[in-house]
Design a protein with these regions (language model features):
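Membrane-embedded alpha-helical bundles that constitute the cytochrome b-like, heme-associated redox core
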Residues: 1-120
Length: 120
């Protein structure tokens, strides 16, 4: 499997997330962009899992430490991102803290994906 989609999907999700943060700071909410960010992030996680575990009938790539940890961080970012609109309505501080945790886990996952891809 080529590495281009594996690197392009998380970077595209991260770039769109940066746009969404700027819009959030301006008080603008774009549900279509949020949905696209969700699809790109879950697509990146899916490609990573397929690379780690292998497609049906094939073997996966050697995961090493970076691959498994990257999958964990991306899964954590997806989980926090899905919970943020639900739990973040309680207070602005809670929403911003969850958004910071989502961004931190996502950036760590993307950087570990790149590190893992460069070590293959």
């Amino acid at each position: 499997m080529p590495m281009v989609p594996f690197i392009a999907l998380p970077l595209a999700a991260m770039a769109l997330g940066l746009v969404l943060v700027v819009l959030h700071l301006r008080g603008i909410r774009k549900p279509l962009l949020i949905g696209l960010h969700l699809l790109l992030g879950l697509g990146a996680l899916e490609v990573l899992v397929v690379l780690l575990k292998g497609a049906p009938g094939s073997d996966g790539l050697p995961a090493g430490d970076f691959g498994n940890v990257a999958a964990g961080f991306l899964a954590l970012a997806a989980f926090i991102g899905l919970l943020t609109p639900i739990l973040g309505r309680r207070s602005r501080l809670t929403g911003n803290a969850m958004l910071l945790a989502h961004v931190s886990a996502g950036v760590a996952g993307v950087l570990l994906c790149i590190a893992w891809a460069s070590s293959l």
